[in-house]
């Protein structure tokens, strides 16, 4: 009677062969198997003697039946897991979490829950072990054809079956068999270690988006909930006192909290106890109080830009105003821009549009005023318009006979927080020898300007009815004062031709305005920053040469910016210069950069309530965008038309 192993070797059906593969048993064949790449080839000999395999784990029932019948009765059933009824991928979620029922509890006890554990560690097969990898195992997981799975189907040689079964079982199963055969604890993935020590970081880069969303991570489910709870605690203002920071209680760096709200929390009792009509300098929650001022200006200093330019009535405006409004010497833009124009262009609206276009959407036109050909425009950062009072203006005409208001003064005033400002732009009488007329223009201006009107004086005890400059905390007076350099053109040109640098201090000794200010006959209490630029008048249009006409006017510092303060040291000049690149007029624009001390105020003043020129704002933005599109199209056409030549 033939042995059981012999019967099985000659009578195994395809379905039985598949069952052996699913239980981890190799197919027993008498023919040579084609080796799979990456595995050890089988021996050239036939039979189980030359290719030893571990004994089968199929229990044999003792019976007197025919061996062929016994072989047919021994039909191993595939395990419930893994199911190879469909094509699986190593990246499939179910494949990463697969576990055998018999080893699931043991793995949990031995290894514990680790969010860094891989799928190969979590899957351990309870199957017989083999001393070396099987030649029929492949790296692919293919679906077993149903026609081949039917029990009792026949046909095909063992060699053909080995070729067909190649690629049915993945490398993962092979690894699991090896782990089970070792008898020890399941293998673990090696810990990840940096190849080198990373550099020290001074910023927190904690981010929920960088956290691995591993399904085996027990903390993943409630991670978002914990983060939301932390933010609620950080931004909660229901406590008995105001937190020190909107980010109080949060362990994130301020630099990494860009998605958090940086608005200061407002206590409910501050809103209920506060009265709009009766403000206080130190009232908590006051709109113009110290607390609000500290939010925007911690050092209580605001940046101010003041400029003057005699445009000579030219209709043509410069192609760019960047050098005028955005000088390269300033790293940052200013909080307030005040521009005074004398002999302005006929289209005042176009001029203001150009200013809005240059400054961009971060600034709005707070107010603008005109007196004949005298223009003044005030642009402020859009987030500061809520702290301005109503803007008032007044005018003075010094040339009464003329119907055209070319000479005179224009004053604009308002209060910012608790500091009152007065800006005056003037065009005094021209002529080398008309110093007395210019002194008269000054006296008439300080007496005739009727400011302020509705906004109360911040310090009425230090005000004078005969001098408008005494009624405000900070005063800036700028314009074309027409004071000349005495001594004649020849003497002035001799100074200008000095090399390598012009001795400006020696040149200013001949300045009429400097001489009159030292006498105290004009601009009493005013100061001027040191001058380090060349005379701003009179140039040939479009050129850097001074007047070459028959009149041969003497180069002079006619365009000036002066300042005055009630409190000494409140105004600090940062830069005082001219714009030699703007050559559309016979005058060069002159500007000054200042830091001005700002004090808290009361809420009982008439506020502008965010009023600004909305129409001009929209026009400036549209023009800015259209020019940017044109510039980009020009760059594209230029790059596409470039020709590369090889010589």
Swiss-Prot record:
GO terms for cellular component: axoneme; cilium; Golgi cisterna membrane; Golgi membrane; nucleus; plasma membrane; ruffle. Disruption phenotype: Deficient mice display signs of ciliopathies including prenatal and perinatal lethality, polycystic kidneys, arrest of eye development, abnormalities in primary cilia, cerebral developmental defects, and skeletal defects. The modification Cysteine methyl ester is found at residue 644. GO terms for biological process: cilium assembly; negative regulation of phosphatidylinositol 3-kinase/protein kinase B signal transduction; negative regulation of protein localization to cilium; negative regulation of translation; phosphatidylinositol dephosphorylation; phosphatidylinositol metabolic process; response to inositol. Keywords: Cell membrane, Cell projection, Cilium, Cytoplasm, Cytoskeleton, Golgi apparatus, Hydrolase, Lipid metabolism, Lipoprotein, Membrane, Methylation, Nucleus, Phosphoprotein, Prenylation, Repeat. Belongs to the inositol polyphosphate 5-phosphatase family. PANTHER family: 72 KDA INOSITOL POLYPHOSPHATE 5-PHOSPHATASE (PTHR46625), PHOSPHATIDYLINOSITOL POLYPHOSPHATE 5-PHOSPHATASE TYPE IV (PTHR46625:SF1). This is Phosphatidylinositol polyphosphate 5-phosphatase type IV. It comes from Mus musculus. The gene is Inpp5e.
């Amino acid at each position: 009677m033939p042995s059981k192993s012999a019967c099985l070797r000659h009578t195994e059906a395809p379905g039985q062969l598949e069952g052996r593969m699913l239980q981890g048993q190799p197919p027993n064949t008498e023919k040579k198997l084609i080796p799979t790449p990456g595995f050890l080839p089988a021996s050239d000999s036939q039979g189980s003697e030359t290719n030893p395999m571990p004994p089968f784990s199929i229990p044999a029932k003792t019976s007197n039946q025919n061996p062929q019948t016994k072989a047919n009765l021994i039909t191993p059933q595939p395990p419930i897991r893994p199911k190879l009824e469909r094509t699986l991928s190593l990246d499939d979620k179910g494949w990463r979490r697969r576990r055998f029922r018999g080893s699931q509890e043991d793995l949990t006890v031995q290894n514990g829950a680790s969010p860094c554990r891989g799928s190969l560690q979590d899957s351990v097969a309870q199957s017989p072990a083999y001393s070396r990898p099987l030649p029929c195992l492949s790296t692919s997981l293919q679906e077993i054809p149903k026609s081949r799975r039917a029990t009792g189907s026949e046909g095909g040689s063992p060699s053909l079956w080995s070729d067909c079964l190649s690629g049915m079982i993945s490398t993962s199963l092979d690894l699991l068999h090896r782990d089970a055969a070792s008898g020890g604890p399941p293998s673990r993935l090696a810990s990840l270690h940096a190849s080198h020590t990373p550099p020290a970081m001074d910023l927190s880069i904690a981010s929920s988006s960088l956290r691995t969303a591993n399904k085996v991570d027990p903390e993943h489910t409630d991670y978002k909930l914990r983060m939301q709870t932390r933010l609620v605690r950080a931004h909660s203002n229901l406590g008995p006192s105001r937190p020190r920071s909107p980010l109080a209680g949060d362990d994130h760096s301020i630099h990494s909290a860009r998605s958090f709200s940086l608005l200061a929390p407002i206590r409910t009792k501050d809103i209920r106890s506060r009265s709009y009509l009766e403000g206080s300098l130190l009232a908590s929650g006051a709109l113009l109080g110290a607390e609000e001022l500290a939010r925007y200006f911690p050092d209580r200093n605001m940046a101010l830009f003041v400029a003057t330019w005699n445009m000579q009535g030219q209709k043509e405006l410069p192609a760019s105003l960047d050098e005028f409004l955005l000088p390269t010497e300033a790293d940052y833009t200013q909080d307030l821009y005040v521009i005074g124009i004398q002999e302005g262009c006929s289209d005042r609206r176009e001029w203001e549009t150009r200013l809005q276009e240059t400054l961009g959407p971060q600034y709005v036109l707070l107010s603008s005023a005109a007196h004949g050909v005298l223009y003044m425009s005030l642009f402020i950062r859009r987030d500061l318009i809520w702290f301005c009072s109503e803007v008032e203006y007044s005018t003075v005409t010094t040339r009464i006979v003329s119907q055209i208001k070319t000479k005179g003064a224009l004053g604009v005033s308002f209060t910012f927080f608790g500091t009152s400002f007065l800006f005056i732009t003037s065009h005094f009488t021209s002529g080398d020898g008309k110093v007395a007329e210019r002194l008269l223009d000054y006296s008439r201006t300080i007496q005739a300007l009727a400011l302020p009107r509705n906004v109360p004086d911040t310090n009425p005890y230090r005000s004078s009815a005969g001098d408008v400059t005494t009624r405000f905390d900070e005063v800036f007076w700028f314009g074309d004062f027409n004071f000349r350099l005495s001594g004649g053109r020849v003497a002035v040109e001799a100074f200008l031709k000095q090399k390598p640098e012009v001795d400006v201090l020696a040149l200013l000794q001949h300045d009429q305005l400097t001489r009159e200010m030292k006498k105290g006959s004009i601009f009493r209490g005013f100061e001027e920053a040191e001058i380090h630029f060349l005379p701003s008048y009179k140039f040939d249009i479009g050129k850097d040469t001074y007047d070459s006409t028959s009149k041969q006017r003497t180069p002079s510092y006619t365009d000036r910016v002066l300042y005055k303060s009630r409190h000494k040291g409140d105004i600090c000049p940062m830069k005082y210069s001219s714009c030699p690149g703007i050559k559309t007029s016979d005058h060069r624009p002159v500007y000054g950069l200042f830091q001005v001390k700002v004090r808290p105020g009361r809420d009982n003043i008439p506020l502008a309530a965010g009023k600004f020129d909305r129409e001009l704002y929209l026009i400036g933005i549209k023009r800015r965008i259209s020019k940017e599109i044109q510039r980009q199209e020009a760059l594209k056409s230029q790059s596409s038309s470039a020709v590369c030549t090889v010589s």
